[in-house]
């Protein structure tokens, strides 16, 4: 399948899901997990485009527990925010995120490998997930879903439709 079709499919999925996603907030741990997911997605795309499979594998091995935890926490956010549709929403988000990173990489193809070499070394050497998240923020890693952080004034779950009266 052509990359443009994959991107269009991801964009369509986001357009369908965006209105429902927009009103949902994320707890700080969920927001951090989404940021770590974005960094991992970015590094995966760079690994493929720059033939850095071994470096990516080192990153994943070194931070496996943090990456697994971030994935679970992100899934928990989508289930909490969207109930029964949460798993499908998480899958759509994951697909859209990787497609967006691939499109971004295509735009910067000539500089992608050079510009991300240091990021890879820093990511592999990072001591913990907090440092990885700081790196993602300082490098302005693309995020396709950025819910507001929950406060006492924001809803923590999407509103349920009213039950029909019998």
What kind of region is each of these model predictions?
Residues 17-19:
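N-terminal signal peptide c-region/cleavage motif recognized by signal peptidases
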Residues 66-165:
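Compact alpha-helical subdomains of small soluble proteins
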Residues 28-84, 94-100:
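Short N-proximal segments of mature Sec-exported proteins
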Residues 11-12:
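Intrinsically disordered, low-complexity acidic/Q/S/K-rich activation/interaction tracts characteristic
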Residues 1-8:
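Bacterial N-terminal signal peptides that target proteins for export
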């Amino acid at each position: 399948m052509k990359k443009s079709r994959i991107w269009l499919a991801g964009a369509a999925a986001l357009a369908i899901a965006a209105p429902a996603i927009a009103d949902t907030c994320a707890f700080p741990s969920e927001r951090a997990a989404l940021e770590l997911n974005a960094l991992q997605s970015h590094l995966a795309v760079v690994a493929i485009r720059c033939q850095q499979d071994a470096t990516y594998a080192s990153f994943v091995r070194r931070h496996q527990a943090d990456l697994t935890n971030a994935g679970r926490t992100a899934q928990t956010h989508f289930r909490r925010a969207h109930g029964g549709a949460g798993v499908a929403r998480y899958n759509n988000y994951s697909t859209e995120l990787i497609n967006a990173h691939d499109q971004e990489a295509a735009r910067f193809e000539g500089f992608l490998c050079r510009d991300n070499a240091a990021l890879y070394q820093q990511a592999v050497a990072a001591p913990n997930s907090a440092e990885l998240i700081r790196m993602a923020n300082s490098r302005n890693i693309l995020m396709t879903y950025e819910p507001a952080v929950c406060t006492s004034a924001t809803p923590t779950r999407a509103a349920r439709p009213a039950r029909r009266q019998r």
